[in-house]
Amino acid sequence: MLDMNPQETYTAPEEVNTPSRPIDENALLQRHQVMVKRVVNQLRVHATSHCSIEDMQQIGLIALVEAGRRYGDIDDTHFPAFAVCRVRGAILDELRRLDWRSRKTRQQAHELNDVTRDLTRSLGRMPTDSEIIKALGTDEQDYYNRQNAALAGEMQSLDQLMENSTDSHFGGQYDGMEHEHIRRSLDSALGRLSKRDQLLLTLFYQHELNLHEIALVLDLTPPRICQLHKQALKQLNQLMSS
C-alpha cells in the first residue's frame, strides 16, 4: 500500500531515469510479486465469475511490468509506491469495465446511504448498525454486503488521486524525481488533515484494515467511518488541487 509517512530528506538524482530504460522483467516480477498478491488479497471480495482472483493476479502482474517499463529504474527506492498505484488501478479499471457491481448491488448501496442519511437527520446523530439494519428491514449479513458495495467505489480513490495529480503535472510522463514531487505534495496535504482523518486513511490504505476493524480502532460505527473516509478524500483532493 501507499506509504503515507513523509520522507525526511530528499536528494534529486544527478541523472533522471527515462521510461524507456531497459529493465530486468524477471527480476522485477520476482521482487514484487508478493506486493501484487497483497493488492489482490485486499480486493478479493470483489472477485466475480467474470474476474476471478486468478484473473486479478494476472492483471496485476501485467500492470507491474508496465509500471516498470514506464518508470525505468526499478531499483529506485520510490518505485514500489508507484507500482502499487498502477497495479491497484489496473485491477480496479478491469473490475469497473466488467461492471463488477451489478445494478441491483448499486441500488442496494444507494439505499443504504439514503437510509443512513435519513436516520442521521431524524436522530441527530450517526445511527448504530442495529438501527440501520432495522430500518432496512434486512439481516446483518446483507447489511455488511451493502456496506462493502457502498465502499467499493471508493477503494481506488487515494491511488487515483495521486495518479491524476501526476498526470496533470507531468502529462503522464514519470521518473523518480517527478513521482517523488507528487509524493511530497501528498504528504504535505495529508499533514494538513485532522489527526483522526490521517489515522483513518493510514489504517485503510497503509495497514489495509477493513471497515469494521477501523470502526473498532476509532470507536465509531462503520457508517460513520464511511462518511469520514469520503470527507477526508474530498478535503485531500481540494488540498492537492490548490
Curated annotation (Swiss-Prot):
GO BP: DNA-templated transcription initiation
Gene Ontology MF annotations: DNA binding; DNA-directed RNA polymerase activity; sigma factor activity
Pfam families assigned to the protein according to its UniProt record, in alphabetical order: Sigma70_r2 (PF04542), Sigma70_r4 (PF04545)
Annotated SUPFAM superfamilies: Sigma2 domain of RNA polymerase sigma factors (SSF88946), Sigma3 and sigma4 domains of RNA polymerase sigma factors (SSF88659)
Described function: Sigma factors are initiation factors that promote the attachment of RNA polymerase to specific initiation sites and are then released. This alternative sigma factor is specific for the flagellin gene (fliC) expression.
Gene3D superfamilies: 1.10.1740.10, 1.20.140.160
Keyword annotations: DNA-binding, Sigma factor, Transcription, Transcription regulation
Motif (Polymerase core binding): 55-68
Induction details: Under conditions in which the polar flagellum is not functional.
DNA-binding region: 211-230
Protein name, per record: RNA polymerase sigma factor for flagellar operon
Species per Swiss-Prot/TrEMBL record: Vibrio parahaemolyticus serotype O3:K6 (strain RIMD 2210633)
Entry annotated with the keyword 4Fe-4S: no
InterPro entries noted in UniProt: RNA_pol_sigma-70_dom (IPR014284), RNA_pol_sigma70 (IPR000943), RNA_pol_sigma70_r2 (IPR007627), RNA_pol_sigma70_r4 (IPR007630), RNA_pol_sigma_FliA_WhiG (IPR012845), RNA_pol_sigma_r2 (IPR013325), RNA_pol_sigma_r3/r4-like (IPR013324)
Family designation: Belongs to the sigma-70 factor family.
